[in-house]
Amino acid sequence: MKITEGYMPYLGYKTYYRIAGECSGNKKPLILLHGGPGSTHNYFEVLDRLADEGRAIISYDQLGCGNSYVEGHSELWCSKTWMNELIELRKYLGLNELHLLGQSWGGMLSIEYLCDHKPEGIKSVILSSTHPSSKLWAQEQHRMIKFMSQEDQDAIAKAEATGNFDDPAYLAANERFMLLHAAGVPKDTDPECLRRPKKIGTDSYITAWGPNEYTPCLLYTSPSPR
């Protein structure tokens, strides 16, 4: 299978992209929008095998993480940056027609892209593990917190009330929450792309989303009313 890697100049930095297969195949390409913000494209490599069916599978690291990592520059970390990045990447790779898959934060970006920009050439859209409303998301995460021990619930509530997200009790509680409801530890038997070390965009995540999965700062503007 042919793997093509490259970089697109963007805002004075570089956006890394990866193409499995050929864009000239008999099926329209599928572009993948990863989660986070700041989670990298790595886990999408499990979909490389779809390229054997004659469809290019395109993933990329959104600015601020992975091979597109940028140190600092908190002014960049908003949906506008990543929205325009997607628009520019389509132009750069000549993706006039394509299928779109957005996972988690990538799904939020996909929804905003479709609602606000009404792009042409989108043949289909797949939304995975995502939502249209940060407010509803936070409500559901807090419902799941209630299934945790009282000690963990208290530690999380205290952190949210005080704004101190460095307390050891909170950090331990949040780690347990993530293992239970968000992201387990990769096993030795998992595909290499899931076990590979990656440069997570912590700054972009905290700035654009918040300190954790259940306390969104709401810099992301929910398109749900639209």
What are these regions (language model features)?
Residues M1-K14:
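N-terminal cap/lid segment of alpha/beta-hydrolase-fold proteins
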Residues Y13-V70:
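Conserved HGGG/HGGXW glycine-rich cap/lid loop of the alpha/beta-hydrolase fold
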Residues Q62-W105:
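Active-site loop/oxyanion-hole signature of alpha/beta-hydrolase fold enzymes
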Residues E97-Q139:
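Conserved hydrolase catalytic core segment
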Residues V125-T162:
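Flexible "cap/lid" loop of the alpha/beta hydrolase fold
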Residues E160-P216:
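Conserved alpha/beta-hydrolase catalytic His-Asp/Glu region
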Residues Y220-R226:
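Conserved small/polar residues in nucleotide/adenosyl-binding loops
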